[in-house]
Amino acid sequence: MLPKRRRARVGSPSGDAASSTPPSTRFPGVAIYLVEPRMGRSRRAFLTGLARSKGFRVLDACSSEATHVVMEETSAEEAVSWQERRMAAAPPGCTPPALLDISWLTESLGAGQPVPVECRHRLEVAGPRKGPLSPAWMPAYACQRPTPLTHHNTGLSEALEILAEAAGFEGSEGRLLTFCRAASVLKALPSPVTTLSQLQGLPHFGEHSSRVVQELLEHGVCEEVERVRRSERYQTMKLFTQIFGVGVKTADRWYREGLRTLDDLREQPQKLTQQQKAGLQHHQDLSTPVLRSDVDALQQVVEEAVGQALPGATVTLTGGFRRGKLQGHDVDFLITHPKEGQEAGLLPRVMCRLQDQGLILYHQHQHSCCESPTRLAQQSHMDAFERSFCIFRLPQPPGAAVGGSTRPCPSWKAVRVDLVVAPVSQFPFALLGWTGSKLFQRELRRFSRKEKGLWLNSHGLFDPEQKTFFQAASEEDIFRHLGLEYLPPEQRNA
């Protein structure tokens, strides 16, 4: 168990000025959000505390509740660019807040009440904005910007992701990240890219990624991307790494040994682990998309087994489905109990119940690692939670389709499921980490380390200087500790 953080670190994002709640709110119809860029963190914290002391409601994170958004040293076009990005992530029918210069807030503080909004306060432009987005409003870290599941530049981002995947197959982590980050920027743009000039000044867009986009805009295809897509190496590595239990290193070794097909693997079972044999045996089902209806059925089954094994324990869906995906290739569930320590020993009991029902085709149990809290904090991305890597035997209703096709369906299908158990004190961090996306989490850890000097992983947030852990009761608390605007799961599809 991670030790509890007994006091707020001086100067931390969780300090009183940034997060305390005033005794009363005198103006219930007004909800202010202060935008940190250009204003600065310390000044924002000071103004937040001052406004709250005078009865103003100031939001810690931008949300649909905001009625007044205040910026400093910001042009009207930059403000509108920021607004467009936020509204693209907002729920349908959400009313945009007023975009205001800092002068409105200072006058309101002086008057002791919100002053009427005049034209001189507003950061607006007449007519639709033209030209590319201001680079100032495209943050460098993916965890600083909303990235919806459905965006405007799918063809461009998918091309870069193919190059990223190919780079990963060759062990080139640097090139993989370069292409992934460029693709992530495209996903976050509020409008389609139609000219290369729109990318000028945007972060993570170097010469190579720009050249790929230019070819796609001019010709509809990129020769490099098509060459990679058609190559035997890429196709074989993609095929092998889609097998349950097979990583890049194993796939590369098989390729160098001359293996090219699934039949090649079936002919040499001595090369396979038990996990890989199970993955190969059920490969057809496991390569068929898992639908949202399958996820709902699986969650019901898991919740029943968990509830019988430990009343009061909870099961939370994570992964891509929590980010809004309607289909995927595996399902992740996070299990905890509101009383710390009660979750110990739960997973084996759950697995026994599922096996007794004939619902488990394969599972591999991984015990939690008994590392010291500080050692756990130092781990960059791999967590040490107890878990089971499973292949479920999911019953199918009569007449169900297979992967959306019209052909008859067997009575069951194999589905990849991971069950992960976390103590309740670490649950918010585990939920954040297991929700993804992979790049979003990588960027969140990088931001924590480089910008805040903190260590973040699925176990906690650690201050190496103070040697203390931050407490968090929710994902929102973690974002607040890091001084970031909260992004809901649906906006983490970086």
Swiss-Prot record:
Q: Give residue numbers for the modification (Phosphoserine).
A: S12
Residue span of region Involved in ssDNA binding: 323-332
Record keywords, A-Z: DNA damage, DNA recombination, DNA repair, DNA-directed DNA polymerase, Magnesium, Metal-binding, Nucleotidyltransferase, Nucleus, Phosphoprotein, Transferase
**A GO biological process this protein is involved in?**
DNA recombination
Residue positions annotated to bind Mg(2+) are D330, D332, D418
> What's the cofactor?
Mg(2+)
Its principal location? nucleus
Coiled-coil regions listed:
none
Please give the SMART domains that the UniProt record associates with this protein.
POLXc
Q: Is DNA damage there in the keyword field?
A: yes
What residues does the BRCT domain cover?
Answer: 22-122
Show the catalytic activity. Answer: DNA(n) + a 2'-deoxyribonucleoside 5'-triphosphate = DNA(n+1) + diphosphate
Task: Tell me its family.
Answer: Belongs to the DNA polymerase type-X family.
Q: Tell me the protein's name.
A: DNA-directed DNA/RNA polymerase mu
Organism this protein belongs to: Homo sapiens
Gene name, Swiss-Prot/TrEMBL = POLM
